[in-house]
Amino acid sequence: MTKIKNYTLNFGPQHPAAHGVLRLVLELDGEVIQRADPHIGLLHRATEKLAETRTWIQNVPYMDRLDYVSMMSNEHAYVLAIEKLLQVDVPLRAQYIRVMFDELTRLLNHLLWIGCHGLDVGAMAVFLYAFRDREDIFDMYEAVSGARMHAAYYRPGGVYRDLPDQMAQYSKSKIRSASAIKRLNENRSGTLLDFIDQFTNGFDANVDEYCNLLTDNRIWKQRLVNIGIVTPERALQLGFTGPMLRGSGIEWDLRKKQPYEVYDRLDFDIPVGVNGDSYDRYLVRMEEMRQSNRIIKQCVAWLKANSGPVMSDNHKVSPPKRVDMKTNMEELIHHFKLFTEGMHVPNGEAYSAVEHPKGEFGIYLISDGANKPYRMKIRAPGFVHLSAMDEMSRGHMLADAVTIIGTQDIVFGEIDR
């Protein structure tokens, strides 16, 4: 008599829907998943160990390369942990700038997520729409830091520099017509804040476009509704955070529950799901984009009305002004020590977490008083979410594995570290 056995399928790490270098070993009964075993580590770069050999400020660019689609949110957790150890006060204007760019980063992340999630499931148009808005946010990154992705803009004590008074404009090009360049430069004649203001005024309408393409689309609903259900109790037991937890109906958001920077001064809502399936998580993230846009508008209004410093005046943490450096020996010494040796952080340990686009992103630092960390531990939200892959996909069809990976919104830079 013939014995029927389950068969094993390797999904990835080269698969286009694997969102990076994910290898899934799937045990299938026909097309039904019986077991899903994620294999990670293919993008491991020893970031935590490298941090022990670099100064505190040299580690900021490494943060950008963890979750490489939510760059400034990673930096934020790191500098908050250092500020806890240093006991330094951050100027209010710098706090508003950080919050504004945190929320722009959330838009950047969620736009890539909806584009790729749609593409994985078979909806190609939304991918093209999403990248239109991402280009504008990359221009904002470039305006403050000179880099379109890996900004390294946040610093312990504030931010690298104030917002520019003039938004950069597109110049003549062989790849664009004169009319296209004129259209691109229409809203770039003012300051960066003017550019962000115009972006936010039109962004809610763009989110409506994405919703019109997907929310009531019957194929989209067939692919997401009742797929990857996680109950509220199980979500807590598994350690879910961010949209994965809120999609299961639990209203937990660090911006509200443990406010940092100026979030307690801002007005916004926390969207939550009901059923805990992939469709609810989609709805939560779409509403999060609207709420982030609302926060950005409030930050822009405050920043336009209020000026001030964007960096701590403690010159053991931040460099002195160039004019002071040329007239004052002590300031010159501070500058020399800061850029050759780096700051010395007092003995101690600190944990700091931010409401990252993917969940709670935490940095745990131990200092032994030296100019570099003694130990750094990164709490990556995607690591926890991917560990639930087996439980979320068991009993679903093979094609649903792609949907579940998409709804988890995983990026291997932070998972493998």
Curated annotation (Swiss-Prot):
It is found in: Cell membrane. It comes from Polynucleobacter asymbioticus (strain DSM 18221 / CIP 109841 / QLW-P1DMWA-1). It is an enzyme of class 7 (translocase). The keyword Methyltransferase does not apply. Belongs to the complex I 49 kDa subunit family. InterPro entries: NADH_Q_OxRdtase_suD, NADH_UbQ_OxRdtase_49kDa_CS, NDH1_su_D/H, NiFe-Hase_large. NDH-1 is composed of 14 different subunits. Subunits NuoB, C, D, E, F, and G constitute the peripheral sector of the complex. GO terms for cellular component: plasma membrane. Pfam families: Complex1_49kDa (PF00346). GO terms for molecular function: NAD binding; NADH:ubiquinone reductase (non-electrogenic) activity; quinone binding. It comes from the Bacteria. It is a peripheral membrane protein. Signal peptide: none annotated. Its EC number is 7.1.1.-. Gene3D superfamilies: Cytochrome-c3 Hydrogenase, chain B. Keywords: Cell membrane, Membrane, NAD, Quinone, Translocase, Transport, Ubiquinone. HAMAP family: NDH1_NuoD (MF_01358). NDH-1 shuttles electrons from NADH, via FMN and iron-sulfur (Fe-S) centers, to quinones in the respiratory chain. The immediate electron acceptor for the enzyme in this species is believed to be ubiquinone. Couples the redox reaction to proton translocation (for every two electrons transferred, four hydrogen ions are translocated across the cytoplasmic membrane), and thus conserves the redox energy in a proton gradient. This is NADH-quinone oxidoreductase subunit D. It catalyses: a quinone + NADH + 5 H(+)(in) = a quinol + NAD(+) + 4 H(+)(out).
